[in-house]
Every structure is written in C-alpha cells, then in structure tokens.
Curated annotation (Swiss-Prot):
It is found in: Cytoplasm; Nucleus. The modification Phosphoserine is found at residue 496. Residues 33-80, 224-246, 401-448, 536-564 are annotated as: Disordered. This is Forkhead transcription factor HCM1. It comes from Saccharomyces cerevisiae (strain ATCC 204508 / S288c) (Baker's yeast). Residues 402-413, 554-564 have a biased composition (Polar residues). InterPro entries: Fork_head_dom, FOX_domain-containing, TF_fork_head_CS_1, TF_fork_head_CS_2, WH-like_DNA-bd_sf, WH_DNA-bd_sf.
Length: 564
C-alpha cells in the first residue's frame, strides 16, 4: 500500500514540475512581447560600443535623410592641390618644376606654400637677399598664376615674412624704399624635407632654377590672359620695355583715333586704320594739306596758327597765316617746338560764323596799327641819351609831337605851336590837357611798344619827380591828381573827384614841349624868352636885368643853362 502511495506522489510532483516549467516559459514569452511593445527600435535605450561600431558607415539614402540637415560629403584634397610645406625634398621640388614645364602647367596654381616660394626667390639670387618688391616680381614672373594687381597673395607674402622666424630682415636697400630679407642659415629643413647638407649647398643648387621656367613664353601667356587679346595685338619687345619705363598716355578725341604716347622723348605716332603717320616722314604731305586750306578761315586743322582779329572794328587779320606757316616750317617748328602738341589731322570744321564766338580775351592782343620799323635794338626801359640843345628845338619838338598825336589841332583843345610873334612870346605856354595827362604815370605797369614811347627820366637829382609819381602812397589812397601850369612856371595840384586817374608821365614827356624843361619847378624856356624880348625892345632897364641874369648876354651860356 505504501509503495503505491509513494509512486502516486512522485508522479504528481513530476507533473507539477513540468507544468511549472511550461508556465515559466509562457511568462517569459509574455514579458518579451510586452517589452517589444513598450520599447520602439529608435528609443533612447543606451547601447553598447559594439553595437555602435557595427552600424553601417554609408550615408542614409535621400528618402530616409532629414531635409533640415542634409548630409555633406567630406571634401577630399587632391594630390595636385596639396601645398608642400617641408613635405618635399629639394630634389622632389626641382622634379615637380620640371614636370610643370613639360606639361605646360606654368600658368597654373603651383603646389607650393608661400613660405616655400619666398625661400626659392631669396636663395636663387646671387647675394641671397631680396627686397619685398623684388620677391613680388620674382613670384609674379615665374608663377604667372599670381597677378601683379591681386593684393591677396601679396598680403600673405608679407605675413609670412613677418611671422616666420626663418626669414631675417637685414639692412636697408640703396634707394631707401625697403629692407632686404634673407633666409636664416639652418632653417632649410623647414622648407625641404630631410635637408641637412647646409645652407650653401641649397643656395648653389637653386642658382640654375631658371632652366625650369620658360620666361619669354610665360610673359606672353600672362599678357594674353590679362589683356584678353591675341598675339597680333601685342606690342614688340622694345615697345614693351619702353612702356615700362615711361607712362602711357591715351588721348581720345571725338572725331579722331586714339593717340598713345609711350615715350616722352619721342614724337608720338598717329595710329589710324590704314597707316601710321609720322611727322618726320610725312612733313611734306602735311605742308601741302595745310597750304591748301590755309586761306579757308573756317578750317581749324593743326598746326593751329594764332590769328589776330579786330573783333570790334571788323578789320582783316594782321598776320598772314600762310607766311606764318612757311616761316614755322623753315624753323622746324612742327618737329621741335610743337613735338608734344602734335594732334591727328581731322576734317572737323568750325561753324561758318566762328568769329562771333571769340571772347573778350582776344581784344588784349589786337593793335589798331602795325608796329613802327624804327624800334631800337637796346633795352626798352633804358633812358634815352640826354641832349638839351636839340630837345627843346622847335623843329625837334614839332617832329616829336606829330607821331604821338592822333588828332589834328582843330579837333583838340591844345593851342597851336608857338610862333615867332612877340605877343606869343610874352605868354607862358600852357601844358596840353589831353586824355594822355589823365593816365596812371606808372612806368612799370605796361611795356612800351616802340622806341618813341620809351620813358624819359626827369633830369633832377635822385629822380625826385619819378619817386613822387611812383610812390606807393598815391597808389594806396588812389587820389586822382591833375597838374596845371601857372604863369609863374610852378606846378599846382588840384584834386578832381571826377577824374579817375593821375597824369601820364609817359605822354607828357613827349606831347608837351616843356615837360622835361622844368628845373625844380622853374620853366627855364619861358624865362629865357621873356629876357630876349626885353632885350629886343631896347628897354632902359637892360643893365638891371643883366645883373639878375648875366648869362643871357652870351648865347654860348644859354646851352650851359639848359645843361644845368
């Protein structure tokens, strides 16, 4: 009985064990299902490093990527654009320069750093030092990628020179415009990888670096790129060199081609569509062209001849343009005096009535009568020789007054010349009150036009009257003065508010017979006339007059008085 009960109990226990195992398995499955429902695939559950490393490295497709933050592919540097800053040896750099020359890549961007370019420029020089401008020039010529007008790479060159301790600033240049820069000895390893052969070896190796560059072809390609023109439009080598020395000037007229002056010491050539006009070679043709049109007053073609016209009177020109041009050709004025005023010959015509466009400026150059031919060759401001005997002679006075007078005695207010009549000798001649007496008596304001109008200085000590007339006091107060003669022979001043100027010494010296005969305000001529009249009348008081004037009895003494 007991064995049966034990077997029943064991069977029941095994059943319970199996049942519990099934229940536990179901419970685990239920928990896993609930866990999957609660935790989505992209939840914030911390993941291990292994799971993170197992993620694929390829980017997401456009369908699954976010439009807000698109993925950017990482930029990869190519081997050709990589700059060598101490990564290449000296031989590798020279080989790369040779490949660039063979492949025709000299105008492309070089794969070298700015510090390497500076080092190459300095060490290739014979003295091993260059100024900043020389470094610019060497880099621009050997690597045309860097334009001369571009300031960005030039700023980088300056920064490298200032911040890199491999470059040393030494003495000042000869012109005083900059300092020399050198490479510090022992700093070659910064530019050339594994270089331990010394400074002098590197410098000697770079002395023949010019063979890796085609300088002539590089300059031609550079000019084509900068100007955008072909080889046919490029200037010759000599013109290119001269253009660098002298500034280029372009003159553009409305109806004429461009005139380019590349040299200041050469006569410019006039470039036209068909030919080039050179004033030296085509002088005869230019003379013929201008002589054909010289009589045409409406043509304004070079050389521009200055003509004088009376704008107010309408008189003809005082200068013959044809004669003026022929005289200029004989003196070679076109090729020498006007070498910088040579302009292209055009067919531009002025208006038909171009005279009315003349301004008042032209009136300053017109003369109402041609100049006299008896002008002296000496200085215009020198005084004339003093001749007291002939100066006051009646014939000479008459001759002197004729060329200066513009009006007849009938139309003027002047009295007729003194005659030999006795009544006329008793009167003191009056000074001429003409318009000339009311001009400013300054002798330095205007230049005399002929020899007859030269200023005659007063025959007095220290030129007192001249100092009085030219005194700055009268010019400052601007007080007009009129000089009036009195019977006593003295000069009086009269303020005239209606007159705007002072008497003219220049005119009074020539028009008046007694302008220069006054001796300290005394009219010697009138005194002498009155004395001779009294002698001829046979007055009883002759002896008393001779006591006061003893020199009147001897004619030879008269000249002496006048000399005094």
């Amino acid at each position: 009985m007991m064995n049966e009960d034990i077997s029943i109990i064991d069977g029941h226990n095994s059943f319970l064990t199996e049942k519990s195992t099934v229940l536990l398995t179901q419970a685990k499955r239920t928990l896993e299902d609930e866990k999957e429902m609660i935790t989505p695939p992209s939840s914030t559950v911390r993941k291990t490093m292994k799971e993170v490393n197992k993620r694929p490295s390829h980017p997401l497709s456009p369908d699954h990527s976010s439009p807000i933050a698109p993925s950017k592919a990482k930029r990869q540097r190519s081997d050709t654009c990589a700059r060598s800053n101490g990564n290449l040896t000296l031989e590798e750099i020279l080989q790369s320069l040779e490949r660039r020359r063979i492949n025709g890549e000299l105008a492309k961007k070089p794969p070298y750093s700015y510090a390497t370019l500076i080092c190459l420029a300095i060490l290739q020089s014979q003295e091993g030092k260059l100024t900043l401008s020389q470094i610019y020039h060497w880099i621009h010529v050997h690597f045309p990628y860097y334009k001369q007008k571009d300031a960005s790479w030039q700023n980088s060159i300056r920064h490298n020179l200032s911040l890199n301790d491999a470059f040393i600033k030494t003495e000042k240049s000869c012109d005083g415009k900059g300092h020399f820069w050198e490479v510090r000895p022992g700093a070659e390893t910064k530019f050339f990888k594994g270089e331990n052969r010394g400074y002098e070896f590197v410098k000697d190796s770079l002395q023949d670096i010019g063979k890796y560059f085609e300088i002539d072809s590089t300059l031609d390609e550079l000019e084509q790129v900068e100007s955008g023109e072909g080889n046919d439009d490029l200037p010759d080598e000599e013109e290119r060199e001269e253009a660098g020395k002298f500034p280029s000037i372009e003159i553009q007229l409305n109806s004429s081609p461009i005139l380019r002056v590349s040299q200041l010491h050469h006569i410019p050539q006039l470039k036209t569509d068909n030919s080039v006009l050179n004033p030296h070679e085509n002088l005869e043709s230019m003379r013929n062209m201008i002589e054909n049109d010289v009589n045409n007053i409406d043509s304004l073609e070079p050389p521009y001849v200055m003509k004088k016209y009376h704008t107010s009177l309408g008189l003809p020109s005082l200068v013959n343009a044809k004669d003026h041009f022929q005289a200029g050709v004989k003196n070679n004025n076109i090729t020498q005096a006007n070498r910088f005023n040579t302009l292209p010959i055009t067919s531009a015509k002025s208006p038909q009535n171009f005279r009315k466009y003349f301004t008042s400026f032209n009136s300053n150059f017109e003369d109402l009568s041609p100049l006299r031919s008896n002008v002296g060759a000496g200085s215009l401001l020198d005084p004339l020789p003093y001749s007291p005997l002939k100066l006051y002679d009646q014939k000479n006075l008459a001759l002197m007054s004729k060329p200066q007078s513009q009006q007849s005695y009938s139309n003027s207010q002047l009295p007729p010349p003194p005659s030999s009549h006795g009544s006329d000798l008793l009167k003191t001649p009056k000074m001429r009150h003409s318009d000339g007496l009311e001009k400013t008596p300054s002798r330095l304001i205007s230049t005399p036009k002929d020899g007859n109008s030269i200023l005659r200085k007063w025959q007095t000590p220290s030129h007192l009257f001249e100092d009085l007339y030219c005194s700055p006091l009268f010019r400052a107060i601007e007080t007009p003065i009129r000089y009036i003669t009195t019977p006593g022979g003295t000069l009086e001043t009269q303020i005239s508010p209606r007159k705007s100027s002072a008497p003219d010494v220049l005119t009074s010296a020539t028009n008046s017979k007694f302008a220069s005969s006054g001796l300290f305000g005394v009219d010697v001529y009138s005194v002498w006339k009155r004395a001779t009249e009294k002698i001829s009348d046979g007055n009883n008081t002759t002896d008393s007059n001779q006591k006061h004037h003893p020199y009147h009895n001897h004619p030879s003494n008269d000249s002496g008085n006048e000399k005094n």
